[in-house]
Amino acid sequence: MIEGRVQRVGFRASCNRRALDLGISGWVRNLSDGRVEVQAEGPPLALSELRAWCEVGPPGARVVRVTPSQLPITGDDWFEVRY
């Protein structure tokens, strides 16, 4: 979960591009409470790089907190923006 000023700043689209560049699969979506949720799978180094990116976000974002969680692996081979 990503908290702060993370909606209406292009966070999902930017996260999608970054994840694809890193070869990560999963998804990103806005939540109704103003947070952004990301589920990502991939090599540990790529996941660390995506997390570091999420801690800053795109220009205009003001990330306050990134809270990771461990989820079951799905084996998907794409990354998408969910609505």
UniProtKB/Swiss-Prot annotation:
PROSITE patterns xrefs: ACYLPHOSPHATASE_2, ACYLPHOSPHATASE_3
InterPro entries registered for this protein in UniProt: Acylphosphatase (IPR020456), Acylphosphatase-like_dom (IPR001792), Acylphosphatase-like_dom_sf (IPR036046), Acylphosphatase_CS (IPR017968)
UniProt keyword list: Hydrolase
Q: Where is the Acylphosphatase-like domain?
A: 1-83
Reaction equations catalysed: an acyl phosphate + H2O = a carboxylate + phosphate + H(+)
EC code(s) of this entry = 3.6.1.7
Q: Which Pfam families match?
A: Acylphosphatase (PF00708)
The intrachain disulfides are: none
Which is one GO molecular function term here? Answer: acylphosphatase activity
Which Gene3D superfamilies does this entry report, sorted A to Z? 3.30.70.100
> Active site located where?
R12, N30
The keyword Zinc-finger is assigned to this record? no
Which PANTHER family does its entry note?
ACYLPHOSPHATASE
Note the NCBIfam families from the entry: PRK14452.1 (NF011023)
Q: Which family does it belong to?
A: Belongs to the acylphosphatase family.
Q: What is this protein called?
A: Acylphosphatase
- Write down the species: Synechococcus sp. (strain CC9605)
